[in-house]
Amino acid sequence: MRNRLLSLVTLFLSLSVATAVSASPPPKAGLPLQQELASGSALVTDQNTGKVLYSRNPDLVVPIASITKLMTAMVVLDSKLPLDEVLPIAISETSEMRGVFSRVRVGSQISRRDMLLLALMSSENRAAASLAQNYPGGKNAFVKAMNAKAHALGMKNTRYVEPTGLSLHNVSTARDLTRLLVASRQYPLLSQWSTTPEKTVAFRHPNYTLGFRNTNHLINNKTWNIQLTKTGFTNEAGHCLVMRTTINRSPVNLVVLDAFGKYTHFADATRLRRWLETGQVTAIPAAAKAYRLQRDRERGLGQPVAQAVR
């Protein structure tokens, strides 16, 4: 009888627990799934509040390729050197330029303004190298100014060794580059030059003209409102993209680094915009995912989890 009573009590308690569990509130409905990216690191923040909207490995130190040129242009503007001064295309002080193809002829001349335009709009390496070589004190003084500016902006994990981004030793993080994007708001010419769709530039000595286009094809997409942009690529850095743009009617800073494929960084930006505006998750191609996982393993990252605040 006693054993039977104990069994009934146990059964009653089990049913009570089960009922309590089943009656507990379900997970909140409507929470969006997390968007996966093909890029190794990324960060999206609200320009007005600084709130993080999406992040993936934001403090991972990686090569940044031609994203470097944003700092190059900023240092030139800080110098207050005359923008209409005509300068020679000179690259001898930047050893990374050896063997790098360019349509721009060494020794020909354009204005400092046009050099800045070409460096930002079409990522012209000879223009960026020439800006440094025509700086007071030359390339070495210029690189010193780049690193001093990074330090002043609180870019603690950033280092520059040359002005083009060709060196794998030009490194930064998504978080540091977000600080650079924030600072760029004080330089309206950076926005103007970096978002110019295309331009024909006239060179002197000898006289010739060349047409250039923006390296970010999203500039021509009317569904995007881009205030500033810069792309970058080297084998070591992968495909990189930074933008000041508008998502969900709010101004944001967007950084994606080390993406696989010629258009993957643009696709990741589009995935992020769609997800932030609608909650819709978009799959990434298998090849792009395999590349990202391989890069993660090479860096000992395992399976980092993206985080977001929505």
UniProtKB/Swiss-Prot annotation:
Keywords, sorted A to Z: Cell shape, Cell wall biogenesis/degradation, Hydrolase, Peptidoglycan synthesis, Periplasm, Signal
GO molecular function: serine-type D-Ala-D-Ala carboxypeptidase activity
GO terms under cellular component: periplasmic space
The keyword Cell wall biogenesis/degradation is annotated on this UniProt entry: yes
Disulfides per UniProt: none
Function: Cell wall formation.
UniProt protein name: D-alanyl-D-alanine endopeptidase
Native source species: Pseudomonas aeruginosa (strain ATCC 15692 / DSM 22644 / CIP 104116 / JCM 14847 / LMG 12228 / 1C / PRS 101 / PAO1)
Native organism taxonomy: Bacteria, Pseudomonadati, Pseudomonadota, Gammaproteobacteria, Pseudomonadales
